[in-house]
Amino acid sequence: MSETFLRPKVSSTKVTDWVAPAFDDFEANTAITTITASSLTFSNSSHRRKYLPSTLESNRLSARKRGRLSLEQTHGLETSRERLSDNEPWVDKYKPETQHELAVHKKKIEEVETWLKAQVLEVKPKQGGSVLLITGPPGCGKTTTIKILSKELGIQVQEWVNPILPDFQKDDYKELLSLESNFSVVPYQSQIAVFNDFLLRATKYSKLQMLGDDLTTDKKIILVEELPNQFYRDPNALHEILRKHVQIGRCPLVFIVSDSVSGDNNQRLLFPRNIQEECSVSNISFNPVAPTIMMKFLNRIVTIEASKNGEKIIVPNKTSLELLCQGCSGDIRSAINSLQFSSSKGENSSWSKKKRMSLKSDAAISKSKQKKKHNSTLENQEIQAIGGKDVSLFLFRALGKILYCKRAPLTELDSPRLPAHLSEHDRDTLLVQPEEIVEMSHMPGDFFNLYLHQNYIDFFAEVDDLVPASEFLSFADILGGDWNTRSLLREYSTSVATRGVMHSNKARGFAHCQGGSSFRPLHKPQWFLIQKKYRENCLAAKALFVDFCLPALCLQTQLLPYLALLTIPMRNKAQISFIQDVGRLPLKRSFGRLKMEALTDRELGLIDPDSGDESPHSGGQPAQEAPGEPAQAAQNADPETWSLPLSQNSGSDLPASQPQPFSSKVDMEEEEEEEEDIIIEDYDSEET
């Protein structure tokens, strides 16, 4: 098939230009220019040329009438602009312009402002690039705060936006990979390379001046809110970029990461503690917007909209706004969107429904004389009807709600008190539901019980109250102990543990006596570290005493304690060291006291990777070893080392956590004055 058949040539004719001149307003009498197309090639020229005259005429008429618009057209443009402003989202319409309009606590604003002044305005030359990490829940004003403060301080903001990759079609691949094509590789650049190139260019060159921008200052920051997805798969690439920026960077780098309690802890994955210390990363954590601040912000929006468009919207009352603030969980963006959606006029409007529901509920309350319970039920329904978010709690706050167990005072209208023989179990009504609290924490029930067991003692005032509390925790452990029924009884086990601990604390059983509401720190459970030590001891016992053919549990509980008391010669120093570590208890005051690691308010709970559950911060991958987190260190050793005969093993074959022979000798010398020496003869092959 010839090429001329595929691409027919158009005869040399004059074709009108389909692009209107840019300066057509200044030359009203100038005719439309024409071009001579001698060899113009179209794939479908006749089809395209068919629509040229109408397009030309419309462009020519619009160009001539561009300068003179009638009054009706001017009024129509103004009307269209008003419609656009009415349909504009309230989040964009009422966005803050100054720091006084921010719905953020003043201390957080001062922290960000102080950091910007110190790292941007007062920075020394050749100091290197600094890094700021801003964290907080969604909708708490992180990005808005940094942009407004930068604007007021005269600092430019260069923001990274993830580029949209071009969509390659099937024909594009055919053309690129054809034999006649000059290049056989599809043009592509990785996200990490694009991000690294952006940082280098932003550090080296100034920002381009757009319409309305003021570039009178050379001070600037680089804002990164949307990180490339590749960094979540390979965090080490981001860490290398941070190290390089700290060394050669000229302007500060600001990262914004939203908190998540559903398992995706991006802050811990992308910015671990060692990287923050190495690169001197400053961390500012934002809190959810307080209900009082949010109420003021929503009242201002309602007042402005009622004065401008009072006939087009339904103005909510104070009670509805309070319910809206409770349902948004501190997310002011979600609250404003819900307010705009609910205030729209119509028969199915949510505010009109709530008014009818409130009238019906008032009538029901007056008849049943149970005002409090009905109001609480109605509040939950209204919060969900407004469009409230799913409330989530960090583990720190969830444990606090269980351990402090705040209660509401009972009134005469409530249910009668318990009989006399059950008066010791009389308590006021709880303000929270324990099962809902555990569900909001996104933590499995058995692991939540571990954190509860680690911290519940400090919240009890009487020893007698600890007895039933420990019994409830034991019952909960029995319910979840059998692996065959663990999946079915896990929720019941958590209910027994949480409700049992809350009920056993008599000092906090009533609203008027809260047992001291002072702050008490929370700690991570020591169970993880003990389990790690136990597994390492089992592996070491099996390897060092393989001749006895006993399980690891029998070795450590039955055989080794007796070997420490007998004068049986051992074959090497590793066996001696292990027996001294496991077979006897040292008489030291600090024995058994492990270091407790504090639980921070924004930290996710640790989950044992060996229990079959995936760690919430690993995204399905094996969790990295951390303090207090179990790890199979002994299993990573060389298997050939454990299979060697005991006579060829040495003390270096033990796991890192096991004491070495030299350290054990020092311990024996320290304890000679307190107890009798234990004589363990070394094996001598010459005597036999």
UniProtKB/Swiss-Prot annotation:
Tissue: Ubiquitous at low levels. Highly expressed in testis, where it is expressed in spermatogonia, spermatocytes and spermatids, but absent in mature spermatozoa (at protein level).
Listed Low complexity bias regions: 342-351, 619-635
Cellular localisation: Nucleus; Chromosome
Modified residues (Phosphothreonine): T55
Chief location category: nucleus
Protein keywords: ATP-binding, Cell cycle, Chromosome, Developmental protein, DNA damage, Nucleotide-binding, Nucleus, Phosphoprotein
Gene3D superfamilies, sorted: 1.10.8.60, P-loop containing nucleotide triphosphate hydrolases
One example of a Gene Ontology biological process annotation: mitotic intra-S DNA damage checkpoint signaling
Region ranges (Disordered): 63-84, 342-379, 605-688
Pfam families: Rad17
Annotated Polar residues bias: 644-663
Gene Ontology CC annotations of this record: chromosome, telomeric region; nucleolus; nucleoplasm; Rad17 RFC-like complex; site of double-strand break
Oligomeric form and interacting partners: Part of a DNA-binding complex containing RFC2, RFC3, RFC4 and RFC5. Interacts with RAD1 and RAD9 within the 9-1-1 (RAD1-RAD9-HUS1) complex. Interacts with RAD9B, POLE, SNU13 and MCM7. DNA damage promotes interaction with ATR or ATM and disrupts interaction with the 9-1-1 (RAD1-RAD9-HUS1) complex. Interacts (when phosphorylated) with NBN; promoting recruitment of the MRN complex to DNA damage sites.
Reported function: Essential for sustained cell growth, maintenance of chromosomal stability, and ATR-dependent checkpoint activation upon DNA damage. Has a weak ATPase activity required for binding to chromatin. Participates in the recruitment of the 9-1-1 (RAD1-RAD9-HUS1) complex and RHNO1 onto chromatin, and in CHEK1 activation. Involved in homologous recombination by mediating recruitment of the MRN complex to DNA damage sites. May also serve as a sensor of DNA replication progression.
Name under which the protein is recorded: Cell cycle checkpoint protein RAD17
Protein's organism: Mus musculus (Mouse)
